């Protein structure tokens, strides 16, 4: 039996891409779509409620005992960083690989977003990974 990777998404948009790009990976992939966090952000619920919700959802996912949790929602990723979550199960955050590759770029970078609600969290995390000298349009 192959180990299981849970992919946590805010929408179904990434499922097909993940399945296609990770078909050779040695994992069985289980997708979990959670739209509620985006609803909480849209309705401007207090940050502490959002953090508590993320912890609750993370605990539910960990009960499934995956080998790996892959988080594709940058809002989830940003909140995970704010709550300093620790778990025995590795959590892979979708943006970290990209940010590592962008560290050495000296030309302006153009970032395009398909979801305006992910801009704040994505840019905060981006600035943590790269130097302030990187110009973003």
Task: Identify what each model region corresponds to.
Residues 1-137:
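Non-catalytic structural scaffold of enzyme domains
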């Amino acid at each position: 039996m192959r180990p299981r990777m849970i992919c946590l998404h805010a929408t179904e948009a990434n499922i097909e891409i993940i399945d296609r790009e990770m078909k050779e990976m040695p994992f069985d992939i289980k997708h979990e779509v959670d739209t509620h966090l985006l609803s909480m952000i849209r309705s401007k619920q207090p940050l502490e409620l959002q953090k508590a919700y993320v912890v609750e959802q993370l605990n539910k996912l960990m009960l499934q005992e995956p080998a790996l949790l892959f988080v594709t929602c940058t809002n989830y990723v940003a909140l995970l960083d704010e709550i300093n979550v620790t778990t025995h199960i590795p959590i892979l955050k979708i943006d970290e690989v990209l940010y590592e590759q962008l560290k050495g770029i000296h030309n302006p970078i153009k970032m395009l977003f398909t979801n305006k609600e992910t801009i704040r969290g994505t840019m905060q995390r981006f600035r943590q990974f790269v130097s302030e000298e990187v110009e973003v349009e």
